[in-house]
Amino acid sequence: KKMLEPDLVGKTFSRPIIYVKRAISGPIETYQNGVEGRKVTSLSRRGKYLLIHLDNQTKLLFHLRMEGKLFVVKKAPEENHLSLYLPFQGEEGGLAFFDTRKFGISYLLKEEDEGPLSKLGPEPSEIKDPNYLYRKYKRSSLPIKELLLDQSIMAGLGNIYANEVLFASSLSPFLPGKKLKKEDCAVLLKNAQKILEEAIEFNGSTIRTYH
C-alpha cells in the first residue's frame, strides 16, 4: 500500500484490459465500465485485501492470494503472468496485476458494500482483549496454525506470518486450539500485533507484493 500510494492517488483509469477472466469478480463489461474514467482518491488495507477507493463512491478490492503482485508501471507491460491491466488516462503506464498462480481476484464494489470483507474478523491491532482469542480457540480441536489462518477469527495473517507468530510464541503449530491457556492467547495476540505492524512498516514478506 505504502509503495503504491504516491504513484496511484490522483490517477484516472482508462478502460481495464483483462487477460485472465477469473481475475475479476462479476461480468467483465460491468467491471470495465465501472472503472473507466474513475480517479483514485485513496488506498487502504483490510486483512489480506488491498482497497483502492475511487471518486464515485466505489472501490476496487484486490485479494492477491499467494503470488499476486501489484505494480505501477511506466508503460504497458508484457503479457507474461499479467492477469489485469488498468491503464492511466492521458498518459503512459498504469496499474498492473501480475499473478503467476492465477488465484488472485479483483472486485468492483460500491463504497458501502463490504463484499468479501464482511466475512473477515478483526485485525490483531483491533483486538484489545486476548480473551477474545481464548473464547474462539478453546472450543476447537483444530491445530493452532489452522486457527491463525482462519480470517473470520482474526484477519491479516497468511502462512508466513502465522509461522513467525507461532515461532515467536514458542508454540507448536500442531497444538489443538482447546489446549491453549489464556496466557498463550495473550502471547499469540501480542506477537501477531508486533509482527504485522513490523511487516506493514517495512513492507514485509507478503505486504511487499503490493509494490
State the predicted function of each range.
Residues 1-211:
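Structured catalytic/nucleic-acid-binding cores of DNA maintenance enzymes
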